[in-house]
A protein has these predicted regions:
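Alpha-helical transmembrane segments of integral membrane proteins
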Residues: 2-3, 112-145, 161, 186-327
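N-terminal signal-anchor/signal peptide hydrophobic helix marking the start
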Residues: 6-16
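Residue-level recognition of pore/gate-forming positions within transmembrane alpha-helices
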Residues: 12, 44-45, 127, 154, ...
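Hydrophobic alpha-helical membrane-insertion segments
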Residues: 16-21, 154-165, 255-260
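Hydrophobic alpha-helical transmembrane segments of membrane transport/permease proteins
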Residues: 16-76, 176-193
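Membrane-water interface segments at the C-terminal ends of transmembrane alpha-helices
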Residues: 25-33, 151-180, 200-202
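Hydrophobic aliphatic residues
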Residues: 26, 30, 40, 44, ...
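An internal, D/E-rich "acidic patch" concept
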Residues: 63-131
Length: 327
């Protein structure tokens, strides 16, 4: 198991190197340091001197990939790609490229807690609600409850998340005045600002997850061990909850585990629409401001979380099914 973990971590490092280079290439294929300087300096008339000063202050005055004027290894090391990559792998995110030059590491720590307040309850409720709803439909399979439940799932997954947001804000905030339409507050006051985003996000994902889990549970109900359990006279509820659910844990773990990075990174759409200052909103602001320092930091953290979550999923498989071995 230790050898497996070491091997996966080494693979993960290679993936991070590839992600870092690909992010760098894509960003500077669309933008140039001069474009970034003009956007951040602002104003109608930006002189070349101001641009060069901005680039020198933020380390963009060097070649991006290859320094032809340098000698030896400095042809590679005295480039923007190398200097930014080394600091990134040392978990030194530096400061943003904007005029405020905020400490990216501090912003991530502060905003991650806010994103967790939104995403962690949503993650837990999503797994419970989707599993329970899917089991309910399987329990009443081939009945009207199952039919209309599937119709409801298809309807929910066919509707855009933006529709839920617009209708929810109009109905619950403007009409009923139950919760604030947007914003955020610290402490227990955060609950009233997070209730609607959590509820609407749950609805937006429930149809997709419940329909997937229902298909997995139905596949399990046709297997020999289920027929044997029924032949022994076990009630259908025990067959479903004790046997079917246990043996369907692996696909559930896969589906739920793939969502784990979003728990930490936040939801881009919901945080932006509801004015929640989490990591999702942080990324949107960085993209709009062409802030490469923030963009590459968030992409790097996202890649680390995805690698870590899939390693955790593999270990969770061995817990859910003792027959699984990590080689």
């Amino acid at each position: 198991m230790l050898n497996y973990l070491i091997r996966r971590v080494l693979y993960g490092v290679l993936i991070l190197i590839g992600v870092n280079f690909f992010t760098f290439f894509l960003f500077f294929n669309v933008n140039t340091p001069d474009d970034m300087a003009r956007l951040n300096i602002g104003g109608k008339r930006v002189t070349q001197e101001q641009i060069e000063k901005w680039k020198a202050e933020r380390g963009y005055d060097r070649p991006l990939y290859w320094n032809a004027k340098a000698e030896g290894t400095e042809k590679v090391t005295r480039t923007v790609l190398w200097e930014r990559s080394v600091s990134l792998f040392a978990l030194d995110f530096g400061r943003s490229d904007s005029a405020r030059a905020v400490d990216i590491g501090h912003e991530i720590k502060t905003r991650m807690w806010i994103s967790l307040q939104l995403a962690l309850p949503l993650f837990i409720l999503q797994v419970i609600a989707s599993t329970a709803f899917a089991l309910l439909l399987v329990f009443f399979r081939h009945s009207k409850i199952d039919f209309w439940g599937v119709v409801l799932c298809v309807l929910m997954l066919s509707i855009s998340a933006l529709f839920y947001i617009i209708v929810g804000q109009f109905f619950f905030s403007r009409t009923l005045h139950l919760v604030p339409i947007s914003g955020y507050a610290g402490g227990f006051d955060a609950i009233k600002f997070l209730l609607m985003p959590i509820g609407l996000s749950l609805l937006a994902r429930l149809g997709t997850e419940a329909r997937l889990y229902r298909a997995m549970f139905l596949e399990e109900t046709g297997k020999d061990y289920v027929r044997t359990a029924r032949a022994k006279g076990l009630p259908e509820s025990i067959v479903l909850f004790r046997h079917v659910l246990k043996n369907a844990l692996i696909p559930i773990i896969t589906s739920a585990g793939s969502y784990l990075p979003y728990v930490f990174l936040g939801s881009l759409v919901f945080e932006s629409f509801f004015g929640i200052p989490g990591l999702g909103a942080f990324v949107i602001e960085a993209i709009a401001g062409q802030d490469f320092a923030i963009v590459r930091s968030m992409v790097f953290i996202g890649a680390v979380l995805y690698i870590a979550s899939y390693i955790a999923i593999d270990f969770a498989y061995t817990w859910a099914d003792p027959r699984v071995r990590l080689a």
